[in-house]
Curated annotation (Swiss-Prot):
UniProt record similarity statement: Belongs to the ABC transporter superfamily. Aliphatic sulfonates importer (TC 3.A.1.17.2) family.
SMART domains: AAA (SM00382)
Protein name according to UniProt: Aliphatic sulfonates import ATP-binding protein SsuB 3
MF-aspect GO terms: ATP binding; ATP hydrolysis activity
Amino acid sequence: MAIAKQTTKRGVEIRIAQLQKTFGDQNVIKDITLTIEAGQFVAIVGKSGSGKSTLLRLVAGLEQPSSGDLLFNGATLKKSQASITMMYQDSRLLPWKKVIDNVGLGLKGNWQQKGESVLHAVGLSAFSNEWPSTLSGGQQQRVALARALIREPDLLMLDEPLSALDALTRSEMQDLIETIWQENQFTALLVTHDVREAVKLADRIILIEEGVIALDVENPLSRPRDVTNKQLIELEKQVTSRILEKE
């Protein structure tokens, strides 16, 4: 399922220093400092309104910080020329375009062969010329993943992309994302409310609480991870109990 010809690690290192973001008089992100290694899979968890999605948008360049620094391989986003793509809870497919055209949306030149390749990588080779309306929710998210992969990301941002899916489809998508990440070695940054999902997928789990980092824990478990594994359950309990402390 590897979608790039490169064999060397291409994930981008992210350095965040004293990052702050205010909206009016509300300080949503408060002095966050952290480093994410190139090729690392990091999950950001926390309650609604904690600032985790705002942090994701800042890293993606969709919002500008009020203060602080964001560096990608030691340079600003623009100067680094890092390829950053995003997946959302909503697949955001255009209903009047075929699946293959949704995958290549905005691309120029001869991208069709590459489009077919990434559709194969996500298990949708047979659906290239279908309309989005004929696909299930899980299949639509696979198209969204293919659309992200065709751009050969250095950083893949995942903003609750699986939260609307049923349990079985969600598990299948988790396995697919993990496999593609392992084969293509980009940096992955996942925002999720699901602590089990974070523990299953991530090398590192970061808890954001009221705009600050409340917990930053490494995940030592080998892959692939079984959600019934005792150590996984214990790590899930550790993170969940910390989230619930202030309730």
